[in-house]
Amino acid sequence: MASVADLIGNTPLVELQKLNTNINVKILAKLEGDNPGGSVKDRPAFNMIKSALERGDIKKNTKLIEATSGNTGIAMALAANLFELEVELAMPANSTRERVLTMEAYGAKVTLLESIEACRDYADEMAAKGDYYQLNQFANPDNVSAHYKTTAPEIWNDTRGAITHFVSAMGTTGTIMGCSRYFKEKNPAIQIVGCQPTEDSSIPGIRRWPKEYLPKIFEPQRVDSIMDISQAEAV
């Protein structure tokens, strides 16, 4: 029988014709909103839980905990529901009510704290007590491998390898790390461009991380250049 998990990935790649005024450049966007949970985060959430179960790191009675600013929480709640696991999600208090309700609808417990950094600290503390298992998207190689195994190959195949630049926001950095690794193996000349908010901008889902909170999966040598993006530019 088909599962919701079968709908994760293989999202469309479409050309942005209206936004691009340079006839010598083709800009393509991957519509990750078509994933069942509504974002690219379905890929790592499902892969992290599935891989942990296969390794025996977690059991069917394991309680999961994760810090998230939004989309990962929805994806984690969905994936945990699919695998019949309990999950608690720590989120910033300024998260939209709709996101919280969506996570709760999938069966997750949601704890609201003052910032994403506080959420990460809380998840670390709860996992250290032994009551929970933290997948830790910020340090989990299965976050990266999800994009190495699915996102990047899909883009490569859909473009038939005709890609010169890959541009990605940097939140957990799982997407840009996994795609960079794959694309550089295929063609080292492909430029990997990361986007982060300017110091005075707040863009939901991505951060300009303080050094002490940089994701452990982030390898700076895998990014050729970083662009600072204002909130107005992001919109």
Stretches with model-predicted labels:
Residues 1-235:
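PLP-dependent amino-acid enzyme catalytic core
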